[in-house]
Amino acid sequence: MVKLHLGCGKRDFGPEWVHIDQADFPHIRYKDVTRLPYVDSEVDLIYCSHLIAYFDREQIKPILKEWRRVLKRKGVLRIATPDWNVLRRMKDPMLGPLYGKMSEPPIYHKTVYDLSGLRSVLNESGFKNVKRYNHTMTDHAQFDDHSAAYHNVVLISLNVECHV
């Protein structure tokens, strides 16, 4: 089974995952999440947590099509991203991290999604059956990443998966 962890940063899910990120950590095998080094229909699962927010809406469409290209017929794309429907109801504490400088070198969120908007861009990119997933019921639930991000007991991640 080929499982990709895109935009993984320092989070190492173990040897059964292929880690892809521009950062320099020992577990990272490839750097470019926009052009994956796989043939068509080779990958079973793609997972990314809080990665797509770094691309604007025009950039993300060809990227999603690339991810779809490498996924097998029954392949799954699993995405966690800041949930705009939740965050827009919150006041100042989350808005800085949402659109502000995130790290050194400076990287910034360029967009946020609600379920309807994310479903639309995924459908336009050829994905089907877009639905929320429970982050505690995945094969990566034991890893601390932003798919399980809570603020004042409210889950702030929009966690969706879809199929080819």
For each of these PLM feature ranges, what is it?
Residues V43-D44:
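Local beta-strand N-terminus motif with an aromatic residue
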Residues Y47:
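A conserved beta-strand element that flanks and buttresses the S-adenosyl-L-methionine
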